[in-house]
């Protein structure tokens, strides 16, 4: 990209039964947009490893604001570390408070953000949240080698999440997102 340099994204490869959950989300979204159901291959092979995975679709029809609750619960349940990477940092009060509380408890809370803005207004909005994060010991880090577009979270080296949901109110309540 001429303006930003290389984009930093993270991709997930999923196998086994969890793929059907992703297909179902795709099917629901496709039907919502096109009012038709495409043919899908539903055959998935069971994964040999004993991995636990879940798919979390969120969006404006989600009455529970699930992504917001998941991020807040990740902060509340973390004991050692909570590392998040997101291109946008405009959390609501509940998520910001959970991040602050985690840091006060001694959790290593780090949020990796892009150095350059792709949406200036959102980038500028984040600065007020920096001022509410740094005094609590939350480490805000900048990615300099291009544009950081990944949306990932690591909790205590035992749980990880990655997908399309950002750390902002649009992803909490408005956008259709999927995280695994």
Regions of interest found by a model, annotated:
Residues 1-180:
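Charged, low-complexity intrinsically disordered terminal segments
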């Amino acid at each position: 990209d001429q303006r930003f340099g290389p984009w930093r994204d993270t991709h997930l490869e999923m196998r086994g039964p969890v793929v059907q959950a992703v297909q179902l989300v795709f099917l629901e979204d496709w039907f919502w947009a096109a009012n038709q159901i495409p043919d899908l291959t539903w055959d998935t092979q069971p994964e040999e490893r004993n991995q636990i995975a879940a798919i979390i679709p969120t969006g404006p029809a989600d009455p529970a604001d699930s992504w917001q609750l998941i991020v807040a619960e990740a902060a509340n349940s973390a004991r050692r570390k909570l590392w998040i990477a997101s291109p946008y940092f405009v959390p609501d009060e509940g998520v910001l408070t959970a991040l602050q509380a985690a840091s006060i408890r001694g959790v290593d809370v780090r949020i990796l953000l892009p150095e350059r803005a792709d949406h200036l207004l959102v980038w500028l909005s984040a600065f007020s949240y920096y001022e509410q994060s740094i005094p609590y010991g939350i480490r805000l880090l900048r990615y300099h080698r291009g544009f950081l577009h990944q949306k990932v979270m690591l909790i205590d080296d035992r749980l990880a999440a990655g997908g399309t949901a950002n750390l902002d109110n649009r992803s909490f309540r408005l956008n259709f997102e999927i995280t695994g």
